[in-house]
Amino acid sequence: MIFVRDGQVFLAKRHGAHGEDTWASAGGHLENGETFEECARREAMEELGVTVGDLRFLCVSNIIAYGKHYVDIEFLGDISGQEPRLMEPEAFIDSGWFPLEDLPEPLFLAMGHALDSYKTGQMYYPGH
């Protein structure tokens, strides 16, 4: 999920998992019986301590990277009036708001797709 505010996107640097030292945002796996939207909201609360309001679907990606193969569903989430904070220090080591035109590198592959989708409207990213 991405959060955009005033031309900036919130990103956190991954730690202790696949894609280590890449920049991403909240995300994770579905729990049994959970919808995509419920999962996105739960992960945002667990990892960043924010309650997501409106969600807008961005894209789906077939990702083969980091020694894994997974399907990624991305949303744009509204967290108006809230400031994300790292709730899981074992998962992220740094964070901040970054201008959409000057992003840190490297981006987690799914985050790159989400940001490209936000900018271009592309909704499907085939496997790499």
Predicted regions mapped to residue ranges:
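Nudix hydrolase/Nudix homology domain
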Residues: 18-20, 89-128
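N-terminal strand-loop-strand
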Residues: 1-24, 52-56
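Active-site-adjacent beta-strand/loop module that shapes the phosphate/pyrophosphate-binding cleft
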Residues: 61-84, 111-119
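Conserved hydrophobic/aromatic beta-strand scaffold that supports enzyme active sites
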Residues: 11, 74-76, 97
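A generic structural micro-feature
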Residues: 22, 65-71, 89-92
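The catalytic Nudix box helix
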Residues: 25-57, 75
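Short, charged/polar surface micro-motifs in flexible loops or helix N-caps
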Residues: 4-9, 17-19, 31-32, 76-83
